[in-house]
């Protein structure tokens, strides 16, 4: 049996509505796996089946019956389902958002007592078997938790849920045990490949949920005796040197940027899970963190003068397949409420493109793209731009940043226009409008990045110039 299988290495951000300037809830994540592994974007329509459906994983044969009614939802699957679906993130017709997963590790003590289940649920299946069947973030926690309790899980993971009012972070810590914490409305959390939830209040069901029998499991195996101070991270998580160079520095940088901290240690194992920002946050604050690489610190790998530039693993790196910010906006009609901001390829070298999940279709470029380069694929357009910039970052970084700024201005203006018109529409007319405008937004991004590619090719330094 595989004791621990790791499929991705991501960074996540969760933000409560009162911490955002516009009262949105936010869940966001970089999906990191391979340096060239395309993603697509799709919308699964609402469907009612006559018979109960059965899901069978192509990855590990995890099998589960599904309800007859499947709600509409968006998703970002792999270009191939040979190794599983990996739908990763989306928003459903009830305005519920889900992102899965933030890969993590459990310690040998807990896995010895409750091993991972080889054919249990894993990252590749979670969005597919949870998001289309829930009407709130809290329901998402409950459904995923019940699946893990019944079928087990083959991995240690963190999962993000949100709706108009609540943001939840879910963590599985062993084969059948899990906890989840609601992010306070005025707070945020940054997570980076470690079990992150700290003190669990077992008597506060409004803000904590957990698996049946977890108290007995922990007590009977002598993992914890003080349940008034039950620390999930300490009991179930790891505390290794690799955590201190791979994981905690990313949390440190996120908190440094969002809270203005200057006195925390990037290698500390005691960084708090829940934090308050030093200002009301905006979407571009979240985008900045997800695209960051320790800027303005001694650890920035893009600054050749930094002796410690490669000491820590950065948040944005070449293995990022896509990055998403799932924004659920307060007080909006449900079909307009959510925006799935999607950046294909490496976050630092891409742009977040808005997509309204009530749309019926996506741009053709988001439906294609395989293992080899394809200039008709959105993934490969953004990936190529990043590769060209990387080759001569010092010379080309300004051209890239100018493009990113132009795209951000165009698309933010576009969202204002779309919202204003969308609020006057309903039914199929609304969905058709959101489809047309979402595709138009995607086209703007593709046009600007193809222009960038042409510019980079034209101005690339020649061997004679670099002698």
Annotate each language-model stretch with its function.
Residues 305-422:
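Substrate-recognition/cap regions that form aromatic- and gly/pro-loop-enriched pockets
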Residues 115-116, 126-133:
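Second-shell loop/turn segments in exported
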Residues 225, 230-323, 327, 331:
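Glycine-rich, aromatic-lined ligand/substrate-binding cores of catalytic
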Residues 133-142, 146-155, 279, 296, ...:
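Secondary-structure boundary elements
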Residues 3-123, 143-268:
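A contiguous strand-loop segment
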Residues 458-467:
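Single conserved hydrophobic/aromatic residue that forms the stacking wall/gate
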Residues 68-72, 141, 302-310:
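Short Pro/Gly-enriched beta-strand edge/turn motifs at strand-loop
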